[in-house]
Amino acid sequence: VKKLPVVTKDMVKQHANEMLTVPKRKVRKGNTSGTTGTPLSVYSDWKSIWMVQAYLYCTRKRYGFTYGQRFVSLRGHLDKNNLSLKIHLSNTLFLSSYNINPANTQFYYDSIRKFKPRAIEGYPSSLYTLALLLSDAGLKLEIPVAFTSSETLLPYQREKIEQQFNTQIFDLYGMTERTISLMEAYNHQGYYEMPGFSINEYLEDGEICTSLINESFPMIRYKSNDVMEMMETTEDNPQIVVKHIEGRKADYLCCKDGSHIILLDFLFKGVKHVKMSQLVQTKDDTLEIYVVPEPDFEDVDKHQIEYNLMDRVGTGN
């Protein structure tokens, strides 16, 4: 594999349609988080999507959660106008990560406490923000297991979340590109590779990964800039272990109602002609959006960004 050339994010962005091995109607489009300022659209076939779910099923079962048990999802599935949604088929309570503010603290507490979940998932910053609000209100929850992903889980976040939720956190690391998947060790001493998911080459300035599960959009020797701190392998433990993951610290947008909006890649969903972007906030009621446009950038792209912002943040917020 190392004899093949490295594929960069810019290369994928320019040649995504040429990389597809099947018609677009047979794949699902996904957008990366754009933590480097350059969001990317990639494609996944249904087989790879089901395989990722199978990996999640096995991993979570190992940590003490079985699919079908009561589960709370505190991620970006719901917008600003929808606080909660229960899906009875999967026994999942979805809560909006865009409405975590002092005014809604009691609602989140009551909803989770009444539901009595076995596990909860969420962005580290979302769970941490809720934990702070619960602490300020003198409230605590009882949730045996918590799963975090999409951002770097910082030590102070882990401590506060585990304290207020009376839980044990297991962190997961993956990419929308489906090129790598790591699970935290049961004893919390580093991260292990998901067997058969990808071939990974760890460098000082990132990693190069080859996906083994997405045949419809093959990512071969794809370069990521997320830096891994490695643990030394020994005869007793020859398996590759990642000690710490850098590069996933997420910024957030402060709203007037006190909520914090994270993973701001949603701003560029459906926007096709932006090379790079930067968001700058100096006051709670002001957001400056800078873009490096492609030649075909037009008003429809600008209006789409404005629509996406209002949809997630809310009018006047």
Regions found by a protein language model. Name each.
Residues 36-39, 78, 176:
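Gly/Ser/Thr-rich beta-alpha loop segments that engage phosphate groups in nucleotides
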Residues 91-317:
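Active-site glycine/GP-rich loop and adjacent strand/helix microenvironment
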Residues 28-30, 38-40, 69-72, 91, ...:
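Generic beta-strand structural signal
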Residues 10, 80-82, 129:
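Short active-site-adjacent helix-start/loop capping segments
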Residues 57-99:
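Conserved AMP-binding loop of ANL adenylate-forming enzymes
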